[in-house]
Amino acid sequence: MARKSFPSGQIIPTDLHEEMERSYLEYAMSVIVGRALPDVRDGLKPVHRRILYAMYELGLTPDRPFRKCARVVGDVLGKYHPHGDQSVYDALVRMVQDFSSRYPLLAGHGNFGSVDNDPPAAMRYTETRLAPIAMGAMLEGISEAIVDFTGNFDNSQEEPTVVPAQLPLLLLNGCSGIAVGMATSIPPHNLGEVVDGLIGLINKPDLSDQELFKLIPGPDFPTGGHILDSEGILQAYQTGRGLIPVRGVSHIETIRGEKKRSHNRTAIVITELPFQVNKAAWIEKIASLVNDGKLDGISDLRDESDRTGMRVVIELKRDAEPNAILQKLYRMTPLQSNFGVIFLALVNNQPVQMSLRQILQEFLQFREDTLLRQYENELGENRRRLELLTGLLIGLENLDALIEILRFAADGTTAKIQLQERLGISLQQGDAILGMPMRRITGLEREKLQQEHTDLAQRIEQLETLIGDRQERLKALKKELRGLKKKFADERRTKILQGMPAKIEPLPVNQDPLPEATIPPVESQSAPEEELDSPGEPEQEQLVLENSSPPTADSAPEAKQDDLNLAVKPTPKTVKQEAQPSPEVIATHSKLVSVAEKNPLTLFTPQTPPAEAFLSINLQGEIAWHPEELTSANSFEPLDQQFSIQGRETLIVIGDHGKAFPVAIADIPPLAVTRIPLLQILPKSAQRDATTVTFQGFLPPPEQPQDLLLVSQQGRVKLLAGQELQELGPRGLSLMKLKNGDLLQFAQLVTPVNPASAQNPGKNLVIATSNGRLLRFDPAQVGLTCSSPSAQGQEAMRLRATESLVGVLMASPGDRVLLLTQAGYGKQLDLASVRLGNFGELGTTVMQFTSKADRLLTMVAANQGAQSPQSSTYDFYSNQQRLHSVQADQFQPWGKDGFGDRLVDLNEGEHLITQVAHLG
């Protein structure tokens, strides 16, 4: 019922409950419509829309200089948003933060806060401007003809009720807000996936939910993380409400002590946290749990995060099990948390809870209506312009008559009337002719007018088709979406782990956790944080566990948990053992995969795989078995190696510390459950001493004896009889004595070395270095024979300070090898052109480089008579996480001099880093 109007100053008696009901309803609707909930069309709340439009009016486009945030906030307050300045600035800051918005709409200059919930600098210090996506996908072409405008709070200005968004920002950046009696919580999504979903609905409006959810598999948070359970996503997308469990990204590292005699330590390293988790508060939570005695096994806790990304190191005590600590962190801290989804937004100024499909359909309807208004407005403008051009061309064609009229006309009005009568033009055309500059009479200007007239006529015809034919309009919409995807889309940051349980099973007190526990493989791709105003590198905060009282003679060597206090102090970053890069050289050899850097942990039930199953190892050194061979169609990550089990029960694993261990095939999990770091399956002594796995494979049958060729990082080589590994026990066997920090880099099974003869020329050992040098020698001639496991081998090749080994193989003197550099240059080389050398030599330079930064990446034997067609293709992985394939026949014969041919097209700043297994 409308409220009665009363004279000003009159006191009206009113029941309290009626006034409270009316006032509260007005307040509730004001909060719902005008403050807390976003519009489904452009995904913006009023404050965000007003900030964008105010900056658009100020001309703060991406190609213009930054402007002080205080100026922007002042314009927003004075023109459109009569609220507190701090609330407007807080909204502006969140639009800049790349950890709050998946696709920030504003670019910032200065300190805009951090993931630790550090406050931003005051608005008088920070500067901002529109981001390219805001200008190119939100505000382009905004005008009263395209979208509706309304008066501001005092009707002195006009503001848009919605911006002509070309992308559904409601899904891209998400939104959260608490209104009166309702709330919204929408997670961010990947732009490329959302565009694919929109195009899928355009092509097939009755697209099934299953097909739609394949195109948009789940949220994509700006801070990364792992989504564990797809059931929560399915429920949220279908009903508009649901819980999505999100887990931080972690891996296990073996940290080498800074002192010589200090022991290696195991640490859990967190590189990504769930969305909206405060890192500093999370670290304090862990510290509190440790001090309260609720979380045992942690000896040190520090934050090593810097501008390159997040890194929180949790060092463990020597007897602690990493998987047990990790499970407790999931259960007791926000390292695993649920993101509550509520798809609530305004539709026609009314709050509506929608499914994912409804949100996409609402946006498509809005975008189609906006395009229609845009085309109609452009058509009207073009028709008016075409009319004027037609008049100008008529005047130029009748130039003599035009001059005569102008010469004898008494005034402009008379001239206009005579032009209309003699040339048959309209009033507007007459005005255009009279206002035409004299330069229009020239021939060149006349041609320009004619060309513009032709182009306008064609555009008008196109616009009439677009307005009259909905299918053509939808084609234009799809073209627009594809263009925006190409311009703004990026890789997914949040990995969705299918089949992972969302619930964390509580561990009983004093229960020994399973040694096989591990979390799924992790790819950390944290984006660099915004550089702060403060100069220099940021200090790292370390939470150190210290005794609150000095130790006494009777005290135990290790402090009790109850006696531990946490103190915050800056410390240098942990010194990590760097894995030496080395490419794969033959099918039976695995390069030095850095298991220490990525050693994730999950629970699985041991089971024996079928005899025909396959084993595969990824670039993180994680292994799993699968019933069928992986191909490019069913593998979603590059592999270091893949081979058939062939009924074997034991796998031989050799670490870079030179020790071999047997691994039961039954201890390896199936790929359907997870991958497990190969190093983690080994005994604790191997996990403590080794940082990488140098070799994994099966022993040959006794009737086909083979020797084991071992080459260290410092260039020492030795042969070991294969029979030494036949009786390998659980305690392992030391294969090579390593001194002075040397590590085992290559290990491969080879045919036993026999003296060469005319009938059997024998095999040569070929070693390649990163500087492009090759050393070839005959093992029999130089006296390379099988030695005992305790021998340290002989110095095969002298290496320079910045040089490392990149390839080792056994080949016949008449064979050819393929060489490839990090910059993508390759060639085929005849080994006969490399002179035979001896132990301790530098070798022969066989590769030239196009730049000083380039290095030889790998050396492989040319596949002459290869049994598998896959072996004729080589795959390489780059520092930009791109996969490049090279065919064997692309390597052309070259001599020792020359760069070779450019075989791989690389982006700027991209270079190849490793060879991976080729998947057919």
Curated annotation (Swiss-Prot):
UniProt similarity note: Belongs to the type II topoisomerase GyrA/ParC subunit family.
First-level EC class: isomerase
Entry annotated with the keyword Membrane: yes
Catalytic activity: ATP-dependent breakage, passage and rejoining of double-stranded DNA
GO function terms (MF aspect): ATP binding; DNA binding; DNA negative supercoiling activity
Function: Topoisomerase IV is essential for chromosome segregation. It relaxes supercoiled DNA. Performs the decatenation events required during the replication of a circular DNA molecule.
Designated name of the protein: DNA topoisomerase 4 subunit A
Record-level GO BP terms: DNA topological change
Record keywords: Cell membrane, DNA-binding, Isomerase, Membrane, Topoisomerase
Membrane topology: Peripheral membrane protein
One of the record's GO cellular component terms: plasma membrane
SUPFAM superfamilies membership: GyrA/ParC C-terminal domain-like (SSF101904), Type II DNA topoisomerase (SSF56719)
Localisation: Cell membrane
Bias (Acidic residues): 528-540
Feature type site, description Interaction with DNA: K45, H81, H83
EC nos: 5.6.2.2
Quaternary structure and interacting proteins, as annotated: Heterotetramer composed of ParC and ParE.
Residue ranges of the region described as Disordered: 499-566
Residue ranges constituting the Topo IIA-type catalytic domain according to the UniProt record: 37-509
Site-annotated residues for Transition state stabilizer: R124
Catalytic residue list: Y125 (o-(5'-phospho-dna)-tyrosine intermediate)
